[in-house]
Amino acid sequence: MEARDVILRPVVTESSMAAMDDKKYTFDVDVRANKTQVRYAIEEIFGVNVKNVNIMNVRGKLKRQGRYAGYTKKRRKAIVTLTADSKEIKIFED
């Protein structure tokens, strides 16, 4: 799996934006990706040093449209912690 296939998009929420001050970045990743693949993908794409990777699976939510019910897609989130001497990731480039 290529590095661009592993990392899908950054997660932009209030808590993930607050965690960026501690050099913790949250990304949606491919559901088949493991911690090692996420680490190498982040280091290759952004050119930073990764200290730690935490991964969690998010179940799909039940959504209803009238009498029809279905689920949203399940997804996988990775919280990547950078080393202290690493540069910051510019998600929103000015």
From Swiss-Prot:
Single GO MF annotation: structural constituent of ribosome
Record key words, sorted: Ribonucleoprotein, Ribosomal protein, RNA-binding, rRNA-binding
Keyword rRNA processing: no
InterPro entries referenced in this protein's UniProt entry, alphabetically: Nucleotide-bd_a/b_plait_sf (IPR012677), Ribosomal_uL23-like (IPR013025), Ribosomal_uL23/eL15/eS24_sf (IPR012678), Ribosomal_uL23_CS (IPR001014)
Ranges annotated as spanning the membrane: none
Tree of life domain: Bacteria
HAMAP family: Ribosomal_uL23_B
Subunit organization: Part of the 50S ribosomal subunit. Contacts protein L29, and trigger factor when it is bound to the ribosome.
This protein's name: Large ribosomal subunit protein uL23
